A protein has these predicted regions:
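Short, structured segments at the rim of ligand-binding sites
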Residues: 1-184
Length: 184
């Protein structure tokens, strides 16, 4: 979300770009500028996101762990994309929550057919898992209105200082504490 609003782009460091070669290739096909450095990549937003078809595969193929984030981008593309999940079953559980935000996604077996929309609307959504939950937060950052993501224990377990890192990029995100439910 912060990246979508910032013309300067963002530096993502601390990794070898070769290890994410297929992800960067697909992002470039979507119109996103990915300038590789020795220890990461400088990513700049696209004027228009282009649709792309993706199949998850073992390394060096497209990693299943990045499928949810790419689905968020694909849901905003100018056209239709297909994501085929070849590694895990039930990996599209977050897609129904993304639809609640205005995405146009149809799931058939291990395929997600995604038709790009102009934008997302804020909504109350539930994180079904680690990767899907993070993708919902990203979608919420670029949505019109407020998005509340519940069941964030998945995200907290898997991403260290997730909220703080997004805030450092300029994102308007906070971890809200909700009271324990009262059982009658």
């Amino acid at each position: 979300g912060a990246l979508m609003a910032d013309d300067r782009g963002v530096d993502v460091t601390g990794f070898c770009p070769i290890h994410l070669g297929m992800v960067l290739k697909k992002m470039e096909l979507m119109g996103i500028d990915c300038e590789r450095t020795d220890d990461g990549v400088h990513v700049s937003r696209a004027e228009r996101i282009k649709p792309v078809d993706i199949q998850t595969l073992p390394f060096p193929g497209f990693p299943t762990d990045m499928q949810a984030q790419i689905m968020v981008l694909s849901a905003l593309a100018d056209g239709s994309s297909v994501i085929t999940e070849n590694i895990f079953e039930n990996r599209f559980m977050f897609a129904s929550e993304l639809v609640r935000m205005g995405a146009d996604i149809r799931i058939e077996s291990h395929h997600a057919m995604i038709h790009g929309v102009k934008g997302f609307s804020g909504a109350q959504v539930t994180s079904p898992d680690l990767r899907g939950g993070a993708a919902l937060v990203v979608a919420g950052l670029i949505a019109d209105g407020t998005t509340e993501v519940s069941a964030i224990h998945h995200i907290k377990r898997g991403y260290e200082q997730f909220v703080e890192k997004l805030q450092a990029l300029g994102a308007h995100v906070e971890h809200a504490t909700v009271p324990d439910p009262v059982i009658y």
